[in-house]
A protein has these predicted regions:
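Alpha-helical interaction segments
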Residues: 4, 8, 12-14, 20, ...
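Short hydrophobic/aromatic segments of transmembrane alpha-helices and their interfaces
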Residues: 18, 35-36, 100-101
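A solvent-exposed, acidic/Ser-Thr-rich amphipathic alpha-helical stretch
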Residues: 4, 24-86
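Hydrophobic alpha-helical core bundles mediating ligand binding, dimerization, or RNAP-core interactions
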Residues: 11-14, 18, 30, 57, ...
Length: 148
């Protein structure tokens, strides 16, 4: 199986996990020494190993994503495959009754080693910090998507 097919399978399993919190389903996708790195939007962190990665992602989902009734993911560029790396741009639009839609823009990079994710990175567009602060002020909502 090629890495893009692996990643698409992982992404599908991630969406299932988003719904049911069964993180064991994702464990086979990650190397034991995998790293997840987040850059931008004041969320900068580096999580090492599947246990820490899943705990950090779950924290962010519980405190941010799952507070919205709607979450729509759109790939805006790529995926670009180069060797063992895959890169793509995306926008996730969040919605909840009584609030303006909140578009979160960024990029992801995944690197594979021996068929498993060795590195997963998310970085947010440079203007997202300003956009998020303005959205929060207009909607009287405090956003907390921290992973650590």
């Amino acid at each position: 199986m090629d890495n893009l097919t692996r990643f698409l399978a992982y992404a599908g399993d991630f969406e299932k996990t988003f719904k049911d919190d069964d993180w064991k389903r994702l464990a086979p996708c990650f190397a034991e020494d995998a790293v997840y790195e987040v850059k931008g939007l004041g969320l900068d962190c580096r999580l090492e190993g599947p246990t820490a990665i899943f705990a950090g992602i779950k924290k962010s989902l519980d405190n941010f994503d799952r507070t919205f009734a709607m979450r729509k993911i759109e790939v805006t560029s790529g995926p670009d495959v180069e060797g063992d790396a895959i890169r793509m741009g995306w926008t996730v639009t969040y919605g909840r009754k009584g609030l303006e839609p909140f578009p979160l823009r960024g990029r992801s990079e995944v690197r594979y080693r021996d068929g498993k994710i060795a590195y997963l990175g998310d970085s947010y567009d440079a203007n997202m910090e300003k956009d998020a602060a303005e959205w929060s002020a207009r909607n009287n909502v405090v956003l907390d998507a921290r992973y650590a």
